[in-house]
Amino acid sequence: MPGGRRGPSRQQLSRSALPSLQTLVGGGLSNGAGLRCRSSSAVGLSAPPLTALITPEPVRHSRIPDLPLDSNLLFETLLLLYLLVALLVQYINIYRTVWWSSYSQPTASTSLNFHLMDAHLAVFIAVMLSRRLVWTLLSEVCVACPASPLCYVLLLVVRVCVLTLCGWVLCWTLLNLFRSHSVLKLLFLGYPFGVYVPLCCLHQDGSPAADCGFADADGADGALLQPRDFLTLLRENLRQQLSGTHTHTHTHTCPPSPELIRSEVQQLKTDFNRRIKEVLFNSLLSAYYVAFLPLCFVKSTQYYDMRWSCEHLIMVWINAFVMLMSHLLPPHYCDLLHRCAAHLGRWQRLEPGSCSNTPQHTWSDSTIWPQGVLVRHSRCLYKAVGPYNVALPSDVSHARFYFLFHKPLRLLNVLIGIECSVVVYQLYSLLRSERWNHTLSLGLILVCNYYVLFKLLRDRLVLGKAYSHPLGSAGLGMKRD
């Protein structure tokens, strides 16, 4: 009414000081007692939404069965056999002949032009492909042998002899290749390692100091930093690439505090990035030496099907990528990432004026936020998406971590989709192939792909039933905080 006393507007009510969610979520209040005490000093203060009074339910995890996994030695053996078969297929594609023609021509008396092949190059490629298997075999022998001075000396002698033999073979092949090829072609032999050193050895995941290749010095409060030894970085990365194994075993303990959850996420994120780096490097290295390097040493007068050879290169890289991903990211490791993502949660950024009538809170790093709560952080408005949210709203890496792993079967479904696409395409190419080398190469590669696809589908079937089971059932022994 004109001249009357105006009451507080709707916007003033919605933006009035509300009790902090720290006192409401997990704060030990019951039936809104704390709210009634605070509301006596605020005129016309409406009750906060129901979601602010609900304590987030403890996160329940599905317990997955123990699936059979290939040992490191068995996996490296299977990977080496696959790469050797792929190398044989590439040589067939390059040096094939019309062997059914008249035998009057010496080059047509066999199915391949063996006189055009470089045996030293083939030996060099085979040694480079077997580096992981040799190192894994030596590591397994060291673990299996008892701890005694005599065994230690014998293992040391065996290691020195094996590594010396491999080095001598590489030097012998390089010397013969140097005599018969130009320096430009020889540069292709070590090109992957020349790229790996500046891209990977100089970048260490983890803390910011480690990212730049620096280590803490023994100064006051660790304020001074020293550059880490380049040879140390190179030795650590080469040992990791040679062995292909991870000595650090991560476990999920359902940490109670948000700080511990974010710390666990950081550790798992660093370990996951290291595994992905290993997968990418080794898959690209395998495809490079198997399918690309033989093409670099083909004589200019030699004719071969460029399209088919490049297609084989892509297929080898995809298959090696899937094999390494399935081995380095096993089901129990993906389940570990999923459990951590369930505790982390995610924030969705909103427009500042989209929820003006909804209570908004100031984000706190020591609070576990329930789903649907609106918080302000760094002058931006965010909405809690997960049922359990402790992530930093402005941290994009937390959002990516939750997106990748909050669904436990996402990575496995992606790998199955990639492998199924490759198998279907190869079957289609096999039906349309008219040349004997195409039929032979597709048949050999498909046998290897069937084994990989079988393991992926088996894991998907078992894990799908385990994760689809109701979480409240006691039959599966559900784990909760």
Curated annotation (Swiss-Prot):
UniProt KW Membrane keyword: yes
Membrane-crossing residue ranges in chain numbering: 74-94, 109-129, 150-170, 182-202, 278-298, 313-333, 411-431, 437-457
Membrane topology: Multi-pass membrane protein
This protein's UniProt keywords: Autophagy, Endoplasmic reticulum, Membrane, Transmembrane, Transmembrane helix
Any one GO biological process: response to cold
One of the record's GO cellular component terms: endoplasmic reticulum membrane
Keyword flag Endoplasmic reticulum: yes
InterPro entries the record matches: Uncharacterised_TMEM39
Source superkingdom: Eukaryota
Location(s) in or outside the cell: Endoplasmic reticulum membrane
Cystine residue pairs: none
Protein family membership: Belongs to the TMEM39 family.
Stated role: Regulates autophagy by controlling the spatial distribution and levels of the intracellular phosphatidylinositol 4-phosphate (PtdIns(4)P) pools. Modulates (PtdIns(4)P) levels by regulating the ER-to-Golgi trafficking of the phosphatidylinositide phosphatase SACM1L.
Name of the protein in question: Transmembrane protein 39A
Annotated organism of origin: Danio rerio
